[in-house]
């Protein structure tokens, strides 16, 4: 987090045409998450993957997990000219998870 802010300041102050922002995704429906949920089931924390997924989704005010496409669209935005005056920012894309 602070590394990206320091890099953003350094690039801006040196006049480099480089913007540095950080993307902070929440839980995303990916094979990696499915693997983690399966491990939780195997350890006895949940009876099945569906229950584990629903429980994790319920921790988000939006009551669901992100899709990879949603995170990708956020990354495309911060890399685009639409965010040309954005540097040193933290874009939180977590369905409200950290807002609660």
Model-derived regions: residue spans:
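Short, small/polar-rich loop/turn modules that mediate ligand/substrate recognition or access, typified
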Residues: 14-19, 86-88
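Short C-terminal tail/terminal secondary-structure segment
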Residues: 64, 75-77, 82, 87-100
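A conserved structural motif in NAD(P)-dependent oxidoreductases
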Residues: 45-50, 60-71, 82
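Conserved catalytic helix of short-chain dehydrogenase/reductases
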Residues: 1-14
């Amino acid at each position: 987090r602070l590394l990206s802010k320091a890099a953003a300041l350094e690039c801006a102050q040196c006049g480099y045409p480089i913007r540095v922002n950080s993307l902070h995704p929440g839980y995303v429906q990916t094979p990696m998450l499915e693997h983690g949920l399966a491990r939780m089931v195997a350890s006895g924390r949940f009876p099945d993957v569906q229950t584990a997924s629903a429980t994790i989704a319920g921790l988000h005010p939006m009551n669901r997990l992100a899709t990879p496409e949603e995170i990708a669209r956020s990354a495309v935005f911060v890399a685009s000219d639409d965010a040309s005056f954005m540097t040193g920012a933290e874009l939180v894309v977590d369905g409200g998870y950290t807002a609660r």
